[in-house]
Amino acid sequence: MSEPIRVEKIIPKGQGLAKAVIARALELKLPFEIRNKSRFSETLSDGREAHFFLPRGNVLVDGDILVADDGSMIKVSAANQQVVTIASNDAHQLMKAAYHLGNRHIPTQLGKGFLRIEPDSVLEVMIRQLGLEAIHELAPFEPETGAYGGGHRHSHAETFDSDYALAQKVYAEHEKPHVHGPGCSHHHHGDHDHPHEH
């Protein structure tokens, strides 16, 4: 059994490579969950095992070329996966949906007349409340990457949890009992800055 190959280099969309070179590359179909990682292992189409150590912060997209330490080239393809497609002829409604999804830092694919997200029952309820249909299907998922920093993203649940925890902390700090001493600069009910006349 041959040793696993190591893959570290990305050539975005195969820029600068001849079409004949790209045509000879091994194809590797990956779902978004894996394309969003920098460290993973996969079995290539020729049966070899490959360990990927890619630059952090990158999201692989359909057409990227990866170069292994032995010179092998691997063409990335977006694999079909479970997605929710939001299709409409009403551009304004789609814009509203895109706004709400973006506000929650949800990876979203933008297409002509449709949006596409990963399945999420909470988001699907929101989509339907906006008057749009959420259709489950198998399709490649290629969300916009710029909106969440090239791979760094939070689910809406994580965002809510972190925001809620921060709010709780701020509230706790505000409500913490305060011992007043000579150096305290707070003014309190019943305290006066002016002298009393007796």
Curated annotation (Swiss-Prot):
Q: Which GO biological-process labels does this protein carry?
A: protein folding; protein-containing complex assembly; urea metabolic process
Q: Where in the cell is it found?
A: Cytoplasm
Major localisation: cytoplasm
Q: Where is this region: Disordered?
A: 176-198
For this UniProt record, give its keywords in alphabetical order, as a comma-separated list.
Answer: Chaperone, Cytoplasm, Nickel
SMART domains (alphabetical): UreE_N
Which terms in the Gene Ontology molecular function aspect does this entry carry? nickel cation binding; unfolded protein binding
* Family annotation (Pfam families): UreE_C (PF05194), UreE_N (PF02814)
GO cellular component term, pick one: cytoplasm
**Family, per the entry?**
Belongs to the UreE family.
**Purpose of the protein:** Involved in urease metallocenter assembly. Binds nickel. Probably functions as a nickel donor during metallocenter assembly.
| Protein name as catalogued | Urease accessory protein UreE
Q: Which organism's genome codes for this protein?
A: Polynucleobacter asymbioticus (strain DSM 18221 / CIP 109841 / QLW-P1DMWA-1)
Q: Gene of origin? A: ureE
